Amino acid sequence: MPTTALTGIGQLVTNDPALGEGPLGLRRDAAIVFEDGVVAWVGDSAHVPATDTAHDLDGRAVLPGFVESHSHLVFAGDRAEEFAARMSGRPYGAGGIRTTIEATRAATDEQLGANVRRLLDESLRAGSTTVECKSGYGQSVEHELRSVRVAGRYTDEVTLLAAHVPPPEYAGRVDDYVAMACAEMIPRCAPHAKWIDVFCEQGAFDRDQAHAVLTAGIAHGLVPRVHGNQLHRGPGVQLAVEVGAASVDHVTYIDDADIEALAHSDTVATLLPGADFCTRNSYPDARALLDAGVTVALGADCNPGTSYTTSLPFCIALAVRELRMTPDEAVWAATAGGARALRRGDVGVLTPGARADALALDAPSHLHLAYRPGVPLISRVWREGTLAYATN
């Protein structure tokens, strides 16, 4: 098989302490070899084995490709006017998730697919090489089915967000919607998805309703995820731990009992600071979670209403500035942490046998991601060993 070497790496983030310094497994003056889509060798530039091709990175930092474990990409339209109203403190009665449900239902499959492809290309340019993609803007059997099918054209990490908000036709009949989702939607959509998700929050679905949807998904072979504790202290975190969810996302309003439950579970706390930034919400207490030993991931939460960004570098900068994470913690959370949230061991790391997903910065160190917010530092991206994006 053809082999490719990246040499002259000023700083290599492996995320394997056995390969370098600290939790990020940092190596200096390093090299890495890709073969047949995976990492074949990691070591010093001075000792790199012979390869078919080699690229000198001239002192740039190299990291694992970012792992985006939370995105809502299957939608139509935008909510820019709603955003402007929110920022100016004006009421905007036409806004909300239901606006996007209406636009998404009206769009063709081709239009939805083009939007997913556009946003995935944007994510790639920002360094994301693995992207989870949710449905959730259909909220009917027909429209959720086509949403997961559209998502499945572009990613293996498809989530059926079967309970986002009750659609207009189920106003005042949330239990009826849940019964429909469990009896009809989930059985039809499960063959096209990997994950089942719910929005467990006041104004959306309560604990019992969310539990019913998650257990129905589990019965059809889907692995649970939970949107929880975004707007209020509620049952989302405890429910996620109870059902063995891979991740509970947002976790903005939590207490000591929630932190303790997460610390004694395999459920990852996925923080989405872009949503808090764009809504002027409080930020989650990342420091308390990390200090308690909770596994933390970072996601961009790309969606048209509350976080219309695909940039994990931006979220890393927010995490360091607003969530009081260290630069090392934030980079780990956006790479290995995201992989943990997707229960993946082959991405988010640059170790022999891992998938050859990597990015190079126009900077000598990963610290520059938080140090230089808003600067487009991603200069090259490799996916499965193939150069997928380059600035020049």
From Swiss-Prot:
A cellular component term, taken from the record's GO annotations: cytoplasm
Superkingdom, natural source: Bacteria
Keywords associated with the record: Cytoplasm, Histidine metabolism, Hydrolase, Iron, Metal-binding, Zinc
Residues holding Zn(2+): H70, H72, H227, D301
Leading EC class: hydrolase
Gene Ontology biological process terms from the UniProt entry: L-histidine catabolic process to glutamate and formamide; L-histidine catabolic process to glutamate and formate
Record-listed N-formimidoyl-L-glutamate binding positions: Y137, N303, G305
Residue sites binding Fe(3+) per the record: H70, H72, H227, D301
Cofactor note as given: Binds 1 zinc or iron ion per subunit.
Subcellular location: Cytoplasm
Binding site for 4-imidazolone-5-propanoate: R79, Y137, H164, Q230, T306
E.C. number: 3.5.2.7
Main location: cytoplasm
Pathway(s) of this molecule: Amino-acid degradation; L-histidine degradation into L-glutamate; N-formimidoyl-L-glutamate from L-histidine: step 3/3
Cofactor(s) this protein cannot do without: Zn(2+); Fe(3+)
Catalytic activity: 4-imidazolone-5-propanoate + H2O = N-formimidoyl-L-glutamate
InterPro entries per UniProt: Amidohydro-rel, HutI, Metal-dep_hydrolase_composite, Metal_Hydrolase
One term of GO molecular function: iron ion binding
Family: Belongs to the metallo-dependent hydrolases superfamily. HutI family.
Functional summary from the UniProt entry: Catalyzes the hydrolytic cleavage of the carbon-nitrogen bond in imidazolone-5-propanoate to yield N-formimidoyl-L-glutamate. It is the third step in the universal histidine degradation pathway.
Name this protein carries in UniProt: Imidazolonepropionase
Species of the source: Nocardia farcinica (strain IFM 10152)
